[in-house]
Each structure stands twice: as structure tokens, then as C-alpha cells.
């Protein structure tokens, strides 16, 4: 897109209608409306008025993407006029997100996952068949209406291999397809109707010991009455009885820590925001689980969406928030539909709005959809994205509890963390803390995928061993030997066959030199080419680095280059020299990167070299 000519570009009627749905009909002639304001008949919002609209940039870009399949110059120009955003700025935002196309693209696109879990289930063979029978990625169908692209993890690892089909138009359609075959993808590219979204495997469905997953697959996820019949909104009622201070006390006593990877004490975070005098306070639910191999939050949102809403409402009540944002991963269309329906039902029944349950609490939730940027799982990058900017992390301090979304005190928790709060409030903080271990209380959702007989989301008490989890999942199929387990996703670390008795706690994982991270347990049998897998992980971090800081921007590239040379058998200065370079680059990224992406970009690679002796001539 050549920005030199964008000023003369105009949107089509269809594009304008799509933007009207998000931004409202333009008022002034500057925005494309009929009202004349100003001596020359044009006016532009400035200062506070312009800043107040900027946060609508991402929803506006999504409106164009869904209507015509790409962001056209005319559409982008219209957005810039209406929101008073410079074209170069808007272009910089649009080009940051992988799901937005800035060049003409056919209305039908199939994204085929090529990441680690799908590779265990034949995605590379599937892609090879597509290249042979259809053409390379980006190739158009004979009628120009469809194409396909490779994709990083789509969060469907429990039913791999996976694809995501997107069909633009007046009634856009987006749907996950998993497990998928080459024949099915070819049918989609030929105009076939996407099948219904497959049900997630629920290996523990109906287990009376479940807490976080107790309603998933049991209660009707679309019915607020069924949710209430299964205990829904009892926790919110109890929260009103306790009062904000009582809720804070219970959450602190529970010793609940964040389940997204950082493991920060939830009660400490909530109390810090509640005590901030600046107003308003904001609540952000981080539902952008883009760590490869992670899918637990998706299954909570699809299978128990009212629980997410209830938990957010309790968090808002305890911390004094009047507005909540649920930042949802762009590749989760089914979760989007489930949450939109649940929000509408909750508003209709006064569980959201100006007077929640008649208790005087004013609180509502808005969904903000991400657009394919791994870095937006970082809490401050989410703020930037919601505010209509590139999702680049901020320097800390100041911390979000002081200066967060829109510069105000902000609570950020992920989906699993929030849903835990329901049990904390319904029971008590001390009762919650009795489950698990002293340093890791409660239960944990684990995303078990790869070479296991029964992949899926498993709920286990902290302290269970990796061996017990693999037994729950049926072990490695076909009697093949276990080669390794990737814990915590691409930002995590490897464990070997001798590490199966590691207790799955935060402290146990640290002692073993790995991490629980987002709960990924990716099982690899002896058929996996580990050097190739490591290069894929390195390529993932290279692609997903936002490029803001030099250590990460350069280090992720140098790491991948070194791994490529080692795989090709062409090390510079010998294998030991290359391994030393990887270690040095990794240390530099840990020490000097702004955010967790750079700080963990070498974790899996270095753990495989250290623990599994990859590239060192010993069997992995």
C-alpha cells in the first residue's frame, strides 16, 4: 500500500457501511457526513476528542477485514478521517497484526496450523499435499476467490491438525476446523461450506472432583438459567454479602496466584488497584492465550462463558472498576460467539449494567478482539492494543496497578485465574489454600497434547506428578518410547523421560529447571526431529518479536540462524562455538529485553541443549 496516494482513496459503499456499524454514521463533512462545521466546511476532532476515539481503531480495522477480506486504501483513509489518526500511524497499527491483510486478498482464506502440536499429527504432510494439489501458500484458486496460508498455533492442539477458515462478506463467517485433512482444506478452498465446529475433547467430563471444569460439557453453555441451576451467580451474591474488603481478604487468604505464567499473587494485585485514588479503575481479562500448545482458556470461554463474566464482575466489585475489557484472541471465533451471547444474556437479566443484581454496582464488559499478535499476551501490550496502537510492551515501572489502560489503575488477570475466584468466594480463602501445596494452592488446568492417547484439558491439584498426568492422558500411543515433554509452551522448557516424577507445582517446576507457564504439556515420542522442532520454535519467536528492543529483535534472528547452521551440519567454528553463541544470545535477551517474550525466547532451546543433549552427539 502506497501511502502517498491514500488521501485520494475513497471507501466503497460496503466498506463505509461496515465502518458505520462500528463508528456510527459520520457527522461532519470532514468525516464524510453532511454536517458543515468550520469556516471551510471541514472540521477535525482534536485534543481530548481525538484521543477519546482512538481506541476504536482496532474494531474499525476488523470491520473492514471481515467485510472485504483486506484493509483497502479507501477504507483505511476513511478510518483515518473519522478517528483523526494520521495514515502512517494507522498503517503502522494495521501492519502490526498478522490477521490483517494490507494487499488485496480473496474473500475466502484458510489458515493451516504448522506449529509444534499440529506437527505431531501430520500438519507438515498436510501442507505438502496442499502445495502439490493446490499450489504454494498465497496461490489463488482458479476463480480467484480463495487462498491458503500457513499459521502459527491456532489453539486447537487437543484436536490437531487444525485450520481456521475465514470468509469475508456482508455476513462474514469464521470457523475452526479440527482435526482437518488435506481433502477437507481443498474442499474449503473450492467453496465448500465449513462444517460445524467440533466439540472439544473432555476427558474428565462428569468427574465430581472438578472445580474449574465442573460445568464444561455438563451445563448448557448458552443458557443463563442452566448456568444458575449449576451454581452460577452464587459466588457474586456471596461477594455482595462480603463487601469489597471481604472479597479482597478472601482472595489474599487463598494464596491464589496468576495462572498465565507469571504467578503473581492475585490478592496483592487486586488490593493495590483498590487502594489507588485515581479514577476510573479498569479491569482487563487477558484471553489472548497465544502461547503455542495452550487452549485451556478457550475451553472455559466456549464451555462456561457465564463463569468468566461472573468472575470478572466479582473482580470489578472488589477493586472499584466500572468497565471491563475482555481481550480475546483473534483466532477464537467460537469463543467470541459464546461470550457475545453470554454478555447479552447477562445484561438482559441485570447481571451486568447500571445496577448489577440490584446491589448498586455499575459494571459492564466489552470484548476487544486481538488480531494475531503473540506479543499481545503481555499485559501492557494489551493496553496498547486496546488503545488503538501497535501492541508493543511498555517499560515498567510504572506498573499497571498504578498506570495501566488509558493511564489509569488497571487489574489484569487471565481467564483461568479469574474463574478460580468463584471457588475462593463461595468457600473461603483458607479452604481454597488447603488444596494443593503451601506454595501452589488450588488446582491447575493443563493443556495436554502431542503424542498422547487422550489429548485435552485436564484439571489436577497442584502437587500431582507429570507421570500421573500422562497416565490420565493414556500415555504415548502405539507403545512408542517417550522422547521429551515440552512444559509451558514455546517459552517453557523440556523435561526428559527421567523427569516424570517432577511435582507439578510452581516451586517444583522451578527446582527442575522448567516452568508450568500457561499449562502446556506437549508430549513428544521418539519420531520427533528435535533439532527441527527447536528451529521451528526459534522461527516463531523471530516472527513474533515486536522489534521494539534490540536484544530481542536481533537475538531471536541470531538464535534461529545458529540453529539452522547446526541442523545443516555447517556450524561456524564448530558445534561448541555455536552452542556457546546460543547461550550468550539467550543471556543477553534475558538481561536486556523489555518484556517476557525476549526474556524467554531461548528457554526451550537452551533447555533442550542442556537436558536432552541436542546437537551434542548424545541421544536425545
Across the structure, where does each feature detected by a protein language model lie?
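Feature of Fe-S/electron-transfer and energy-metabolism proteins
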Residues: 1-620
Amino acid at each position: 500500500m502506497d501511502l502517498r496516494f491514500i488521501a485520494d482513496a475513497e471507501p466503497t459503499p460496503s466498506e463505509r457501511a461496515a465502518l458505520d456499524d462500528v463508528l456510527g454514521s459520520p457527522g461532519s463533512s470532514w468525516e464524510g457526513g453532511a454536517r458543515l462545521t468550520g469556516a471551510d466546511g471541514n472540521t477535525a476532532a482534536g485534543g481530548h476528542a481525538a484521543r477519546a476515539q482512538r481506541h476504536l481503531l482496532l474494531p474499525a480495522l476488523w470491520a473492514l477485514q471481515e467485510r472485504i477480506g483486506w484493509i483497502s486504501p479507501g477504507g483505511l483513509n476513511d478510518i483515518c478521517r473519522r478517528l483523526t489518526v494520521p495514515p502512517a500511524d494507522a498503517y503502522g497499527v494495521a501492519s502490526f497484526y498478522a490477521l490483517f491483510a494490507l494487499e488485496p486478498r480473496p474473500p475466502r482464506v484458510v489458515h493451516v496450523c504448522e506449529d509444534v502440536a499440529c506437527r505431531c499429527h501430520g500438519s507438515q504432510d498436510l501442507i505438502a499435499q496442499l502445495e502439490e494439489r493446490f499450489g504454494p501458500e498465497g496461490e489463488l484458486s482458479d476463480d480467484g476467490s480463495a487462498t491458503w496460508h500457513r499459521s502459527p498455533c491456532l489453539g486447537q492442539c487437543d484436536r490437531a491438525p487444525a485450520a481456521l477458515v475465514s470468509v469475508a462478506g456482508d455476513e462474514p463467517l469464521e470457523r475452526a476446523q479440527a482435526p482437518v485433512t488435506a481433502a477437507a482444506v481443498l474442499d474449503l478452498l473450492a467453496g465448500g461450506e465449513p462444517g460445524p465446529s467440533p466439540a472439544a475433547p473432555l476427558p474428565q467430563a462428569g468427574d465430581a472432583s472438578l472445580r474449574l471444569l465442573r460445568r464444561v460439557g455438563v451445563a448448557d453453555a448458552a443458557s443463563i438459567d442452566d448456568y444458575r441451576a449449576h451454581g452460577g451467580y452464587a459466588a457474586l451474591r456471596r461477594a455482595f454479602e462480603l463487601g469489597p474488603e471481604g472479597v479482597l481478604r478472601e482472595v489474599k487468604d487463598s494464596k491464589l496466584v496468576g495462572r498465565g505464567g507469571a504467578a503473581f499473587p492475585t490478592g496483592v494485585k487486586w488490593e493495590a488497584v483498590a487502594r489507588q485514588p485515581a479514577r476510573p479503575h479498569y479491569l482487563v481479562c487477558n484471553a489472548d492465550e497465544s502461547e503455542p500448545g495452550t487452549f485451556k482458556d478457550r475451553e472455559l470461554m466456549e464451555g462456561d462463558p457465564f463463569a468468566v463474566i461472573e468472575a470478572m464482575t466479582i473482580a470489578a466489585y472488589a477493586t472499584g472498576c466500572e468497565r471491563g475489557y475482555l481481550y480475546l484472541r483473534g483466532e477464537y471465533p467460537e469463543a467470541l460467539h459464546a461470550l457475545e451471547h453470554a454478555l447479552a444474556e447477562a445484561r438482559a437479566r441485570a447481571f451486568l449494567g447500571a445496577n448489577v443484581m440490584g446491589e448498586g454496582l455499575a459494571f459492564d464488559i466489552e470484548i476487544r478482539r486481538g488480531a494475531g499478535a503473540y506479543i499481545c499476551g503481555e499485559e501492557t501490550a494489551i493496553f496498547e492494543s486496546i488503545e488503538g496502537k501497535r501492541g508493543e510492551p511498555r517499560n515498567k515501572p510504572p506498573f499497571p496497578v498504578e498506570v495501566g489502560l488509558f493511564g489509569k489503575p488497571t487489574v489484569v488477570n487471565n481467564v483461568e485465574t479469574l474463574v478460580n475466584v468463584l471457588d475462593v468466594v463461595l468457600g473461603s480463602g483458607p479452604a481454597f489454600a488447603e488444596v494443593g501445596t503451601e506454595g501452589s494452592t488450588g488446582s491447575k488446568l493443563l493443556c495436554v497434547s502431542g503424542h498422547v492417547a487422550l489429548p485435552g484439558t485436564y484439571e489436577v491439584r497442584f502437587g500431582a506428578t507429570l507421570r500421573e498426568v500422562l497416565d490420565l492422558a493414556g500415555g504415548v500411543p502405539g507403545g512408542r518410547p517417550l522422547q521429551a515433554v515440552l512444559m509451558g509452551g514455546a517459552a517453557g522448557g523440556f523435561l526428559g523421560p527421567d523427569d516424570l516424577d517432577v511435582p507439578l507445582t510452581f516451586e517444583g517446576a522451578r527446582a527442575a529447571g522448567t516452568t508450568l507457564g500457561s499449562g502446556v504439556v506437549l508430549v513428544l515420542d521418539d519420531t520427533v526431529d528435535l533439532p527441527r522442532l527447536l528451529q521451528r520454535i526459534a522461527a516463531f519467536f523471530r516472527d513474533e518479536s515486536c522489534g521494539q528492543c534490540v536484544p530481542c529483535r536481533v537475538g531471536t534472528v541470531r538464535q534461529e540462524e545458529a540453529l539452522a547452521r547446526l541442523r545443516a551440519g555447517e556450524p561456524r567454528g564448530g558445534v561448541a562455538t555455536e552452542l556457546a553463541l546460543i547461550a550468550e544470545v539467550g543471556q543477553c535477551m534475558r538481561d536486556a529485553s523489555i518484556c517476557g517474550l525476549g526474556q524467554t525466547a531461548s528457554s526451550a532451546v537452551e533447555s533442550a541443549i542442556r537436558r536432552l543433549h541436542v546437537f551434542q552427539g548424545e541421544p536425545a
